[in-house]
């Protein structure tokens, strides 16, 4: 689910995702805390697939600020966890990531941006991402 809130010409963007599986799920098909290229992008700063189990929940938020000269910046944060069953969800085990990014609007008549994001997560290597379009 996504929600976008206008704030004096800027945007607060919110997103949450929930995945659940049952039965004998192969490791490669298990839900994970996401770090995917393309338009779906959560947990920038956390290595892809590091945390997997039968269920996953993730939330992220961004503050997007645009300048009049086609440049802008974002600050973002993510939190979430994986779990084997509903009874195993432990909020003290949630993983967190955060960071900032720069934006360049490719054409004035389009909302497509070139973006550079730098993400951090405790005890993980810094992530650097150069992509087109917003994370979500």
Each model region followed by its residue ranges:
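Membrane-embedded beta-strands of outer-membrane beta-barrel proteins
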Residues: 1, 14, 59-61, 100-102, ...
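C-terminal outer-membrane beta-barrel translocator/porin domains of Gram-negative envelope proteins
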Residues: 1-67
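Transmembrane beta-strands of outer-membrane beta-barrel pores
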Residues: 3, 18-24, 65, 77-83, ...
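Short coil turns and loop connectors of transmembrane beta-barrels in diderm outer membranes
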Residues: 7-10, 67-69, 108-110, 124
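Residues that define the transmembrane beta-barrel architecture of outer-membrane proteins
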Residues: 10, 53-57, 92-98, 124-128
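Transmembrane beta-strand segments that form the barrel wall of outer-membrane beta-barrel proteins
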Residues: 11-16, 43-49, 73-81, 85, ...
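Outer-membrane beta-barrel translocator domains and adjoining extracellular loop/strand segments
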Residues: 25-33, 85-92, 127-131
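Outer-membrane beta-barrel "beta-signal"
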Residues: 99-109, 125-136
């Amino acid at each position: 689910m996504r929600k976008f809130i206008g704030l004096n010409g800027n945007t607060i963007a919110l997103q949450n995702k929930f995945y659940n599986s049952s039965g004998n799920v192969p490791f490669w098909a298990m839900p994970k805390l996401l770090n995917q290229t393309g338009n779906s992008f959560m947990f920038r700063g956390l290595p892809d697939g590091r945390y997997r189990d039968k269920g996953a929940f993730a939330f992220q938020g961004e503050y997007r600020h645009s300048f009049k000269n086609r440049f802008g910046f974002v600050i973002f944060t993510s939190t979430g966890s994986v779990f084997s069953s509903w009874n195993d969800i432990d909020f003290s085990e949630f993983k967190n990531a955060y960071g900032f990014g720069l934006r360049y609007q490719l054409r004035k008549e389009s909302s497509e941006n070139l973006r550079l994001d730098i993400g951090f997560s405790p005890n993980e290597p810094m992530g650097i991402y150069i992509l087109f379009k917003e994370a979500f």
